[in-house]
Amino acid sequence: MLRSCAMRLRTLGATPARRPEATRRLFSSEEVVCKDYALPNPSWTKDLRLLFDQFMKKCEDGSWKRLPSYRQNPPQALQEFQTHFVDSKFKKEEQMSKAQQFTRSLEEGLGFEYAMFYNKAEKRIVCLFQGGLHLQGMPGFVHGGAIATIIDITAGMCAFSEGIVMTANLNIDYKKPIPLLSVVVVNSQLQKIEGRKLFVSCTIQSTDEKTLHTQATALFIKLDPDKPLT
């Protein structure tokens, strides 16, 4: 994942001796006051709204959970992350308080429109993604870097269910281009864990599952709170 994605969607806060508070908060039903951007807005197409409603139905029996998504990390969460993982000489609290998550930094409809759903039993994350007009690469199609980003954060969420992680490796095979404003399904699953290494697979398919746009594998490393990142 991109370095900023290590904190994406998460109310970060971890205590070294137990399950990271960030993970507990994200995958629980704890109320938060930040605006949740993983909810329908006027830019969502009919296809995206339909898929969203279908997955919300799946959430009713508790097998799936919709994950929230925020533009900024709460100040307390940011401070806790920096305390455990950032060397004090590199902390820039005033600047960091103004930082925004990359995937939520564009106006609605222009960039990354998506919602994620988590299945704990299957160790799986499904992301419903609509690429906006400001994500263009070749005319009419989503940029490969934007595709890599949505894979990174979706696969990263699978790994994040096991603790606070960052990307070590991302291997992507681009099969078919994704048209702008189309809706695709990003499906990621945690395959295995070896110590601090977490291996995740990911695919992007059309909503009818007839077109495979992308295949990917990713390796994430669980962060050690005793070893600062900087």
UniProtKB/Swiss-Prot annotation:
Output the Pfam families linked to this UniProt entry: 4HBT (PF03061)
Substrates-to-products reaction catalysed: hexadecanoyl-CoA + H2O = hexadecanoate + CoA + H(+); octanoyl-CoA + H2O = octanoate + CoA + H(+); decanoyl-CoA + H2O = decanoate + CoA + H(+); dodecanoyl-CoA + H2O = dodecanoate + CoA + H(+)
Its chief place of residence is membrane
Q: How does it sit in the membrane?
A: Peripheral membrane protein
Q: Which GO terms describe its biological process?
A: fatty acid metabolic process; negative regulation of phosphatidylinositol 3-kinase/protein kinase B signal transduction; regulation of mitochondrial membrane permeability involved in apoptotic process
Describe how it is modified after translation.
Phosphorylated.
- PTM N6-acetyllysine: at which residues? 65
Recorded GO molecular functions are: long-chain fatty acyl-CoA hydrolase activity
Q: What is its EC number?
A: 3.1.2.2
Q: Which residues carry this modification: Phosphoserine?
A: 28-29
- Active-site residues, as the UniProt record annotates them: 152 (proton donor/acceptor)
Q: Which UniProt keywords apply?
A: Acetylation, Apoptosis, Cell membrane, Cell projection, Cytoplasm, Fatty acid metabolism, Hydrolase, Lipid metabolism, Membrane, Mitochondrion, Mitochondrion inner membrane, Phosphoprotein, Transit peptide
> Where, by residue number, does substrate bind?
175, 196-197
Q: Which SUPFAM superfamilies does its entry note?
A: Thioesterase/thiol ester dehydrase-isomerase
Q: Please list the residues that carry the modification N6-succinyllysine.
A: 46, 57, 89, 98, 197
What GO cellular-component annotations does this UniProt entry give? cytosol; mitochondrial inner membrane; mitochondrial intermembrane space; mitochondrion; ruffle membrane
InterPro entries given for it? Answer: HotDog_dom_sf, THEM4/THEM5_acyl-CoA_thioest, Thioestr_dom
Transit peptide boundaries:
1-27
Q: Where in the cell is it found?
A: Cell membrane; Cell projection, Ruffle membrane; Cytoplasm; Mitochondrion
Against PANTHER family, the record matches this protein to: ACYL-COENZYME A THIOESTERASE THEM4 (PTHR12418:SF19)
What quaternary structure, including any partners, is listed in this protein's UniProt entry?
Homodimer and homotetramer. Interacts with AKT1 in the cytosol.
Its biological function? Has acyl-CoA thioesterase activity towards medium and long-chain (C14 to C18) fatty acyl-CoA substrates, and probably plays a role in mitochondrial fatty acid metabolism. Plays a role in the apoptotic process, possibly via its regulation of AKT1 activity.
User: Which protein family is it in?
Assistant: Belongs to the THEM4/THEM5 thioesterase family.
- State what protein this is by name: Acyl-coenzyme A thioesterase THEM4
What organism does the record attribute this protein to? Rattus norvegicus
